């Protein structure tokens, strides 16, 4: 017969939530840092397409 599992404690729940929030904050900080480097023109770790002018095609 199926028996329900024990309830997860508040401490364990809060710990998991804190880890999840910390990972999200780290990802947001990295994204902001990459965005700043792209805007300032100092980005060298990756390649992104540059806009081409239409005069070359005519």
UniProtKB/Swiss-Prot annotation:
Keywords: Ribonucleoprotein, Ribosomal protein. GO terms for biological process: translation. One of its GO terms (cellular component) is large ribosomal subunit. Gene3D superfamilies: Single helix bin. Pfam families: Ribosomal_L32p. The keyword tRNA-binding does not apply. The keyword Ribonucleoprotein applies. One of its GO terms (molecular function) is structural constituent of ribosome. InterPro entries: Ribosomal_bL32 (IPR002677), Ribosomal_bL32_plant/cyanobact (IPR044958), Ribosomal_zn-bd (IPR011332). Disulfide bonds: none annotated. Belongs to the bacterial ribosomal protein bL32 family. PANTHER family: 50S RIBOSOMAL PROTEIN L32, CHLOROPLASTIC, LARGE RIBOSOMAL SUBUNIT PROTEIN BL32C. This is Large ribosomal subunit protein bL32. It comes from Prochlorococcus marinus (strain MIT 9313).
């Amino acid at each position: 017969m199926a028996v329900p599992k024990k309830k997860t404690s508040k401490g364990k729940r809060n710990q998991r939530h804190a880890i999840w929030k910390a990972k999200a904050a780290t990802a947001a900080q990295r994204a902001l840092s990459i965005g700043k480097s792209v805007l300032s023109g100092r980005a060298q770790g990756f390649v992104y397409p540059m806009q081409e002018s239409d005069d070359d095609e005519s």
